[in-house]
């Protein structure tokens, strides 16, 4: 076997391989012998068909199969010998084959980039220092009560957290526009659903009033014909409602899994959940800064084959989220995913190099801790932990999560990490 390697462009490589004619003939004869042992031909017992008849009937197809197998095996031998690491599936380009002559073909593919990590000491990371306070717990209890609130009609003016039922008609330069009209539209105030100024124009009015408000569409508004335009909305305020928050009764508290129904038990459960969410948020904030710094400090070439593969993954994930099928997923334009796919590939390559250079392996104690932390959010943590322990795929996924965390910590060990005190709400919102 003769092998030559050339660079085509960037990460592109072409390996040209020549297989000696006698190697081909030896492999063909060997395969014909195997075929002769299995085939049945009228007039001959199984395994007793003369080789010339076997060759006459099956020679062409056997030769084609043998060439395909030799191309694959010789390519693998070549890249091992040349210490080449292909990224993605190779493309085989066969040359012209002539019986009794050497056979030359080429294989085109991309290789993984050579990554030499740099700039880790210049990465700056700000780690939030946060404590869950009693006031934070109070705020979360209020949120839980609001989520379970009922609505009661009121006679007074609209306030910031009320709910209104309105008819409205919008116009620009005196002309109504598409999508600018609705009847019996229910709007919960304070959630930012409408364009700036719309809710402010309703506040202070009472049910039964009809009025007009002036607003301006944002420059980034999705409808081209409305961007930056001044508009008027004729409003008919039909109903105003205010929240009625439930009391912290034992019955209400038990809905959240606090069996004794006590306020103290609910506060403890809420605090535990908030601290778990806080721990995760801090970890993610620090991780995102470390990865962002790593990416900025290391500009690497990315194999197109890896980006294509990642785009396929993102397409299928998008289709699953929206209830689509695989065919629909493949029809989604690649431009929707290309930037994210490239980013994910770059991050994967860089973290992979961090793992390699630091000789990291998944810490099983960390894996156990991650599973326990995740399971604590469920009603029966022991059942979740047992389910994970019996599922190899889930365990491998969690090991990958742990290994990624260890890689990020290796980056942080060299980065400039400063601490900044902040509040729970500032971090989470």
Swiss-Prot record:
Name of the top EC class for this enzyme: isomerase
PANTHER family from the UniProt entry: TRIGGER FACTOR CHAPERONE AND PEPTIDYL-PROLYL CIS/TRANS ISOMERASE, TRIGGER FACTOR-LIKE PROTEIN TIG, CHLOROPLASTIC
Annotated family: Belongs to the FKBP-type PPIase family. Tig subfamily.
EC number: 5.2.1.8
Any single Pfam family the record assigns to this protein: FKBP_C
Task of the protein: Involved in protein export. Acts as a chaperone by maintaining the newly synthesized protein in an open conformation. Functions as a peptidyl-prolyl cis-trans isomerase.
Record's subcellular location: Cytoplasm
Molecular function in Gene Ontology: peptidyl-prolyl cis-trans isomerase activity; protein folding chaperone; ribosome binding
Descriptive protein name: Trigger factor
PROSITE patterns, sorted: FKBP_PPIASE
A single GO cellular-component term on record: cytoplasm
Residue ranges of the TM segments: none
Description of how the protein assembles with itself and partners: Homodimer and monomer. In vivo most of the ribosomes are in complex with monomeric TF. Uncomplexed TF, however, is in a monomer-dimer equilibrium with approximately two thirds of TF existing in a dimeric state.
InterPro entries linked: PPIase_dom_sf, PPIase_FKBP_dom, Trig_fac, Trigger_fac_C, Trigger_fac_C_sf, Trigger_fac_ribosome-bd_bac, Trigger_fac_ribosome-bd_sf, Trigger_fact/SurA_dom_sf
Single Gene Ontology BP annotation: cell division
Entry text on domains: Consists of 3 domains; the N-terminus binds the ribosome, the middle domain has PPIase activity, while the C-terminus has intrinsic chaperone activity on its own.
Domain PPIase FKBP-type: 161-246
Matching NCBIfam families: tig (TIGR00115)
Xref: SUPFAM superfamilies: FKBP-like, Triger factor/SurA peptide-binding domain-like, Trigger factor ribosome-binding domain
Superkingdom of the source species: Bacteria
Catalytic activity: [protein]-peptidylproline (omega=180) = [protein]-peptidylproline (omega=0)
Record key words, sorted: Cell cycle, Cell division, Chaperone, Cytoplasm, Isomerase, Rotamase
């Amino acid at each position: 076997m003769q092998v030559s390697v050339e660079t085509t462009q960037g990460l592109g490589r072409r390996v040209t391989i020549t297989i000696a004619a006698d190697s081909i003939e030896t492999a063909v004869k060997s395969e014909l012998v195997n075929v002769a042992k299995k085939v049945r031909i009228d007039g001959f017992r199984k395994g007793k068909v003369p080789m010339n008849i076997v060759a006459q009937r099956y020679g062409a197809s056997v030769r084609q199969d043998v060439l395909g197998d030799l191309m694959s095996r010789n390519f693998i031998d070549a890249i091992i010998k040349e210490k080449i690491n292909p990224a993605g599936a190779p493309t085989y380009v066969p040359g012209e084959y002539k019986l009794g002559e050497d056979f030359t073909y080429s294989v085109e593919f991309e290789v993984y980039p050579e990554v030499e990590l740099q700039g880790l000491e210049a990465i700056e990371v700000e780690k939030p220092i946060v404590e869950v306070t009693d006031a934070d717990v109070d705020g979360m209890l209020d949120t839980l009560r609001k989520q379970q609130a009922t609505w009661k009609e009121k006679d007074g003016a609209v306030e910031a957290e009320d709910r209104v039922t309105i008819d409205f008609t919008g116009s620009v330069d005196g002309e109504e526009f598409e999508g600018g009209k609705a009847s019996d539209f229910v709007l919960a105030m304070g959630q930012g659903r409408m364009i700036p100024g719309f809710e402010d124009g309703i506040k202070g009015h009472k049910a039964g009033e009809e009025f007009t408000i002036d607003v301006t569409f944002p420059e980034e508004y999705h409808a081209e014909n409305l961007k930056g335009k001044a508009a008027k909305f004729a409003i008919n305020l039909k109903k105003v409602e205010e929240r009625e928050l439930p009391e912290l009764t034992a019955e209400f508290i038990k809905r959240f899994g606090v069996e004794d129904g006590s306020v103290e038990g609910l506060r403890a459960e809420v605090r535990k959940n908030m601290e778990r969410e806080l721990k995760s948020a801090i970890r993610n904030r620090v991780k995102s800064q470390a990865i962002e710094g790593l990416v900025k400090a290391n500009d690497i070439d990315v194999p197109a084959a890896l980006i294509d593969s990642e785009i396929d993954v993102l397409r299928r994930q998008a289709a699953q989220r929206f209830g689509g099928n695989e065919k629909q997923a493949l029809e989604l334009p690649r431009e929707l995913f290309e930037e994210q796919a490239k980013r994910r590939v770059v991050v994967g390559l860089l973290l992979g190099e961090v793992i390699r250079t630091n000789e990291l392996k998944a810490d099983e104690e960390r894996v156990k801790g991650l599973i326990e932390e995740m399971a604590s959010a469920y009603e029966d943590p022991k059942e979740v932990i047992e389910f994970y322990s019996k599922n190899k795929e889930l365990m491998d996924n969690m090991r990958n999560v742990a290994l990624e965390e260890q890689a990020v910590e290796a980056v942080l060990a060299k980065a400039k990490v400063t601490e900044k005190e902040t509040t729970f709400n500032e971090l989470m919102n």
